[in-house]
C-alpha cells in the first residue's frame, strides 16, 4: 500500500502505446529518451499482462531523419520500479568555484515527494571513502550546500568524482537510499575561449553513433566501455552524441574516465529542407505546431542528464535548418541551465536568429571559398 509502481521504457523507435491488463495507459514518442508510466492502479496480485504496440512511423518520425540504419522496436532496457511513499523524485546538483579555484560550493536541490508523511533526509558527501560533510533536512525542496576547501576538481585529464548519498527516513527507519556522482568543475568562456576550471580546453573530439555491428541499436555496457577506453587510449578527449541522447551509462562512463560531451537533442529534419523542396516544407522552422514537441525533447534530455559533469555543451540537434522554433529551444535551455553553452551548427544555413547558438561551427567546412572542395 505504501509503494507506487512505474514502468519505464528507455528506448522505443519511433512511438509506442501501452496497455496493462487490457486498460490503455498511454502513448509516447521520442525514440531516445525514457517514457515512464504509473501503473499502480492497474496491476493485481499474481499474473499481469503488459502489452505494447510499437509504431515504426509516427509524427515524431518527421523529427528523426538522422543518417543511420533504420530500425523499429524496443531497443533499450524496460524497467519496473517500485517507488516508496516517500522518495527522491528529482535532484539537481550544481557546483560553484571561486576565482582562484581553491574553494567550491556543492549546491544540492532535492525534490522529495511524500504522501502526508513525516520524514528526514540525510545528505552525505564523500570523496572516495572519506566523509567530507553531512547535512540533515526535513524540507522536501530546499537547497543543501556543502563548502569544500581545496576541492578535487573534475576535468577530462583528472576526472575526480565525489559521491553524494541521499538517505530518506520515516518514523520506522530507512525508506530509500540513492547515490549520485558529483564532479566539481566550472566550464565557461573566457575571452571567447572555452575553459574548464580556468584553463583552456583543446578539443580532440569525435562524433559517435550508438551502434553495434552485431546488435544494431542495442549496445551493451561492456561494448560501450571498450569504446570509451579506446578513445582515451588514442588521446580523444571529447565526443558528441550524434544525433540523439545516448544511454545513461554512456555519460556515467564519460564522467568516470574523463571525456567532454556535447549532448544532442533527438532532432534532425534533414529531408525537409533539401534543394528538392521550397521553404514551406521546412521543419520545425517557424511553425508553431512543432514548438511544444521539440521543447519536450529538449526538456527530456536536460532533466535526465543535467547532473553529469562530463556534459559541457547542449546541442539543439543536427541539420534541422534554422528558424524561430530552434531559437525558442535555445532560450528554453538557457533558462534551465546557465552552466553550459548551447550549440547549433545549422545557423550557417539560416542567419535569421544568430543568437540561437553560443558557438559558431560548420558541419562541412570548404577548403576553398565558393567551391565544394
Predicted regions and their residues:
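Beta-strand-rich binding/interaction modules
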Residues: 20, 103-137, 144
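N-terminal carbohydrate-binding accessory modules
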Residues: 91-92, 165-232, 252
Amino acid at each position: 500500500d505504501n509503494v507506487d509502481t512505474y514502468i519505464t521504457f528507455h528506448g522505443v523507435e519511433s512511438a509506442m502505446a501501452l496497455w496493462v491488463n487490457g486498460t490503455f495507459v498511454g502513448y509516447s514518442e521520442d525514440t531516445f529518451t525514457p517514457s515512464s508510466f504509473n501503473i499502480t492502479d492497474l496491476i493485481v496480485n499474481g499474473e499481469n499482462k503488459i502489452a505494447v504496440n510499437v509504431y515504426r512511423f509516427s509524427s515524431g518520425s518527421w523529427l528523426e531523419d538522422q543518417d543511420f540504419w533504420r530500425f523499429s522496436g524496443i531497443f533499450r532496457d524496460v524497467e519496473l520500479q517500485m517507488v516508496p511513499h516517500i522518495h527522491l523524485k528529482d535532484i539537481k546538483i550544481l557546483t560553484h568555484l571561486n576565482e582562484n579555484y581553491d574553494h567550491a560550493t556543492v549546491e544540492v536541490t532535492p525534490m522529495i515527494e511524500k504522501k502526508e508523511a513525516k520524514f528526514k533526509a540525510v545528505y552525505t558527501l564523500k570523496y572516495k571513502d572519506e566523509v567530507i560533510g553531512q547535512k540533515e533536512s526535513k524540507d522536501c525542496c530546499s537547497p543543501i550546500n556543502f563548502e569544500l576547501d581545496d576541492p578535487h576538481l573534475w576535468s577530462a585529464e583528472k576526472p575526480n568524482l565525489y559521491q553524494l548519498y541521499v538517505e530518506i527516513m520515516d518514523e520506522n527507519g530507512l525508506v530509500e537510499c540513492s547515490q549520485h556522482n558529483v564532479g566539481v568543475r566550472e566550464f565557461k568562456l573566457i575571452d571567447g575561449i572555452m575553459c574548464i576550471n580556468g584553463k583552456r580546453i583543446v578539443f580532440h573530439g569525435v562524433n559517435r553513433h550508438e551502434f553495434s555491428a552485431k546488435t544494431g541499436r542495442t549496445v551493451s555496457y561492456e561494448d560501450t566501455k571498450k569504446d570509451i577506453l579506446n578513445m582515451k587510449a588514442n588521446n580523444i578527449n571529447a565526443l558528441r552524441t550524434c544525433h540523439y541522447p545516448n544511454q545513461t551509462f554512456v555519460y556515467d562512463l564519460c564522467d568516470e574516465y574523463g571525456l567532454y560531451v556535447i549532448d544532442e537533442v533527438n532532432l534532425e529534419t534533414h529531408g525537409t529542407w533539401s534543394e528538392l523542396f521550397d521553404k514551406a516544407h521546412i521543419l520545425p522552422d517557424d511553425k508553431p505546431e512543432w514548438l511544444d514537441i521539440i521543447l519536450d525533447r529538449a526538456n527530456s534530455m536536460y532533466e535526465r542528464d543535467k547532473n553529469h559533469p562530463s556534459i559541457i555543451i547542449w546541442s539543439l540537434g543536427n541539420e534541422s535548418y534554422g528558424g524561430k522554433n530552434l531559437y525558442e529551444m535555445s532560450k528554453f535551455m538557457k533558462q534551465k541551465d546557465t552552466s553550459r553553452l548551447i550549440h547549433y551548427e545549422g545557423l550557417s544555413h539560416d542567419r535569421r536568429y544568430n543568437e540561437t547558438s553560443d558557438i559558431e561551427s560548420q558541419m562541412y567546412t570548404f577548403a576553398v571559398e565558393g567551391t565544394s572542395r
